[in-house]
């Protein structure tokens, strides 16, 4: 029995859940796509709880084997608590629900109907794959800044390969032709100032030529 038209509801596609701003030091367990769903323990099980409108209390709906089952349970509670103002994880949850959400008056009634829908609804393998892919993308995005910082630290601690290639083969204990020439003797000065090398034409040799001659 259809109590509401499924297209009248907002979904996580049209109104995605808000993510907390800034960096957090705790491990994120909430599902990146589905509302009211979070991971519990290393076994990979999923739990669902919803906050009652205008209250601080929450309604515990249970632990489920898949994130999709927990997301279905959330939809039942959202329909019961918020009516047409509910934001659903799946657009067809209202159509698949076998009871009128308005009749779910107590937390026990909501929990019972939520578990029934979660267990009876066929879980789409494509939806499960998309959920896993979204979680992997989020984990990769969170790890990227740490990887970049590690890369920068490694680059700062490693000497430049160019500097090593240029200076690594120089023997600083050997005489330097450059500094020998600057000292006023040696091969460098003889080669630079000897005019006989170019026949005395066009060079600095070929006679007594001084700087002030120009």
Curated annotation (Swiss-Prot):
Q: Which PROSITE patterns match?
A: AP2_ERF
Molecular-function GO terms, alphabetical: DNA binding; DNA-binding transcription factor activity
Gene3D superfamilies per the UniProt record, alphabetical: AP2/ERF domain
- Which residue ranges are recorded for the region named Disordered? 1-24
Give the main location. Answer: nucleus
User: CDD domains from the entry?
Assistant: AP2
Highest taxon of the lineage: Eukaryota
Q: Which residues bind DNA?
A: 33-91
Q: Name one Pfam family in it.
A: AP2
Similarity comment: Belongs to the AP2/ERF transcription factor family. ERF subfamily.
Q: What is known about what this protein does?
A: Transcriptional activator that binds specifically to the DNA sequence 5'-[AG]CCGAC-3'. Binding to the C-repeat/DRE element mediates high salinity- and dehydration-inducible transcription.
Name of the protein: Dehydration-responsive element-binding protein 1C
Organism, as annotated: Oryza sativa subsp. indica
């Amino acid at each position: 029995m259809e109590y509401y038209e499924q297209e009248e509801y907002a979904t996580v596609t049209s109104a995605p859940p808000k993510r907390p701003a800034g960096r957090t030091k705790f491990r994120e367990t909430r599902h990146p796509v589905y509302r009211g769903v979070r991971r519990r323990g290393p076994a990979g099980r999923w739990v669902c709880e919803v906050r009652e409108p205008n209250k601080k209390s929450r309604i515990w709906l249970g632990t489920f084997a898949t994130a999709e089952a927990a997301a279905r349970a959330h939809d039942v509670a959202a329909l019961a608590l918020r009516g047409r103002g509910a934001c659903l994880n799946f657009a067809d949850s209202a159509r698949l629900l076998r009871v009128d959400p308005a009749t779910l008056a107590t937390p026990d009634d909501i929990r019972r109907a939520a578990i029934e829908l979660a267990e009876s609804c066929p879980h789409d393998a494509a939806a499960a794959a998309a959920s896993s892919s979204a979680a992997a993308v989020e984990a990769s995005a969170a790890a990227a800044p740490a990887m970049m910082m590690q890369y920068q630290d490694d680059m700062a601690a490693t000497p430049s390969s160019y500097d090593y290639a240029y200076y690594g083969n120089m023997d600083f204990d050997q005489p330097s032709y450059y500094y020998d020439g600057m000292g006023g003797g040696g091969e460098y000065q003889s080669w630079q100032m000897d005019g006989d090398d170019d026949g005395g034409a066009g060079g600095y040799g070929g006679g007594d030529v001084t700087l002030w001659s120009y």
